[in-house]
Amino acid sequence: MVPGQAQPQSPEMLLLPLLLPVLGAGSLNKDPSYSLQVQRQVPVPEGLCVIVSCNLSYPRDGWDESTAAYGYWFKGRTSPKTGAPVATNNQSREVEMSTRDRFQLTGDPGKGSCSLVIRDAQREDEAWYFFRVERGSRVRHSFLSNAFFLKVTALTKKPDVYIPETLEPGQPVTVICVFNWAFKKCPAPSFSWTGAALSPRRTRPSTSHFSVLSFTPSPQDHDTDLTCHVDFSRKGVSAQRTVRLRVAYAPKDLIISISHDNTSALELQGNVIYLEVQKGQFLRLLCAADSQPPATLSWVLQDRVLSSSHPWGPRTLGLELRGVRAGDSGRYTCRAENRLGSQQQALDLSVQYPPENLRVMVSQANRTVLENLGNGTSLPVLEGQSLRLVCVTHSSPPARLSWTRWGQTVGPSQPSDPGVLELPPIQMEHEGEFTCHAQHPLGSQHVSLSLSVHYPPQLLGPSCSWEAEGLHCSCSSQASPAPSLRWWLGEELLEGNSSQGSFEVTPSSAGPWANSSLSLHGGLSSGLRLRCKAWNVHGAQSGSVFQLLPGKLEHGGGLGLGAALGAGVAALLAFCSCLVVFRVKICRKEARKRAAAEQDVPSTLGPISQGHQHECSAGSSQDHPPPGAATYTPGKGEEQELHYASLSFQGLRLWEPADQEAPSTTEYSEIKIHTGQPLRGPGFGLQLEREMSGMVPK
């Protein structure tokens, strides 16, 4: 028994109250000579056919082989004597009107068969049924205890349709519909087909246990329905099965969608899609296409396949970029391909990020190698050289580059490339801090470098004068880097203080200036050559003081000339004095005009780096000494007396590399002797020589 389901009552309980008065008690006795085998419960779907197999045996009593045997199937509560059977082989007996032509006794009771065929089962047919056999005069028996129950169920079974999974457009196809409920002697159902892919003549019904349909699909038939109908009864009981046609076609309707940081996907439209993302973001690219059979999907960056799918896999292919990098920029193409064709869609991905690795590339004259400089770098450049600064950074979109110097914007050398700054031959005014700015919507950076201008020594001096202790000389030089100064007396290097107290050297320095004063005590020998030399890595200069005529230098109150010179020398000096007075007056007028412009270049003898020098330098602004330099200041009423005023430049050259040895050049400049404390001695004179080596500014 099935729990919770109502079970049919036993035939004895149903038939006994009705049949007992009719049949008498004897007919209900269970005689072992009578037996019947039948299925206790027979299910049948409504409208279908079922065969109830049945076998019986009865005693050979009152009949022989020629005696006809009659069998009757009665519905429960029907009197065998007065009621109509639902099926019988007795032609003289009327059957129940509702079961006529549907219930048929197909078995031969004379041969021990009582099988029953039930066609087009109806809901009202559900009941108990028992069999009665009659043969001869004595066999009259109803098998009440061997009845069966006919269970009529709802029709849930559907036909099976056999069709290829994918139909080729333009190619004939055969479809079969089968309903697996066929019994021998049961009538065949009626089959029919409906669908958009079929012409009306294809929908005519046919009667069989299966149906075969042939047609030629077209691409338009894809995703349409095809239905097989199976009809079983005159009351319209039927079953049907619908299949969806899958006609092959090339990929179409390719769609790309994206999602940022695990957000919902956003579908993108356009022939070529442009997408901007920021560096470091999470990005998921999705690609889907409609095709039959399913297409193989792939993501391609440039010509490199990043991922692909199988036709039997998911219909959507995803590509995840975790922490997008700058190198992920490029054209991503989704391709969908099957045996009938292909389709693709492109996406241009631009990864945006602020300036990175900002640096300055430096190109200097006579150098083929570029230097990469970072922030805070000090850049030494030789005066007169050309300089090219290129600001370089990585960003997307490109950052806006600009140059400033001490906070003031510097115009680019090439407007089309604002990151390039070209400086003309470097001068002192170019010294300072240069800053490249890289401005970007996502952030900005800057890099600064300090430009220092280097140049070789510019010698000022030596200049000498008599003082109470002896001869006092001073020498100064300006250079970058700061120069070194040394004194030579003849071939002897003078450093510090002499142990005998014959000389004393006092050095000093301030910024680019180097100063040195020399005090000589005692008598000086004839053929005196006193030399001051300044040098740094870029070159050297030197100046010398000579004693022109032999004799002994003495400190006195005037300039005495030896009797050996005679009256001719006196006349010559008188002539020179007149000439000098005239020159000094002219030079003083010129000096006043140049004083304001040349105050920042102190020099007693005039800087060599000017490229030329006026013959008249006395009283000019360059007579101002450098910081810390020892000078002689004329007293009130004293006049400077010019004894020698000759200046020559020989073989001046442009800057040359420091490792190339340059020839020395001798120059002559003015010697000033103050009349208050003159140098005197028999036949004495002073001459200044400058030796320049290394490189000379243009």
Curated annotation (Swiss-Prot):
Membrane disposition: Single-pass type I membrane protein
Could you cite one Gene Ontology molecular function of this protein?
phosphatase binding
Domain Ig-like V-type: residue ranges: 31-134
A GO BP term, please? cell adhesion
Entry binding sites for N-acetylneuraminate = R132
Q: Where are the stretches annotated Disordered? A: 596-635, 675-698
Compartments where located: Membrane
Motif interval(s): ITIM motif: 642-647
Could you name the Gene Ontology cellular component terms for this entry? plasma membrane
Top-rank taxon:
Eukaryota
SUPFAM superfamilies the UniProt entry points to = Immunoglobulin
Q: How is it modified after translation?
A: Phosphorylated on tyrosine residues.
Tell me where in this chain the Ig-like C2-type domain is found: 159-244, 251-350, 355-452
Keywords from UniProt, A to Z, are:
Cell adhesion, Disulfide bond, Glycoprotein, Immunoglobulin domain, Lectin, Membrane, Phosphoprotein, Repeat, Signal, Transmembrane, Transmembrane helix
Q: Could you list the residue ranges that cross the membrane?
A: 562-584
Glycosylation site positions: N55, N90, N262, N366, N375, N497, N515
The answer to whether keyword Phosphoprotein applies is: yes
Q: Does the keyword Glycoprotein apply?
A: yes
The free-text tissue note of the record is:
Expressed by macrophages in various tissues including Kupffer cells. Also found in brain microglia.
Instruction: Briefly state the protein's biological role.
Output: Putative adhesion molecule that mediates sialic-acid dependent binding to cells. Preferentially binds to alpha-2,8-linked sialic acid. The sialic acid recognition site may be masked by cis interactions with sialic acids on the same cell surface. In the immune response, may act as an inhibitory receptor upon ligand induced tyrosine phosphorylation by recruiting cytoplasmic phosphatase(s) via their SH2 domain(s) that block signal transduction through dephosphorylation of signaling molecules.
Annotated family: Belongs to the immunoglobulin superfamily. SIGLEC (sialic acid binding Ig-like lectin) family.
Quaternary state and interactors? Interacts with PTPN6/SHP-1 and PTPN11/SHP-2 upon phosphorylation.
Protein name, please? Sialic acid-binding Ig-like lectin 11
What is the organism of origin for this protein?
Homo sapiens (Human)
The top of its lineage is: Eukaryota, Metazoa, Chordata, Craniata, Vertebrata
- The gene behind this protein is SIGLEC11
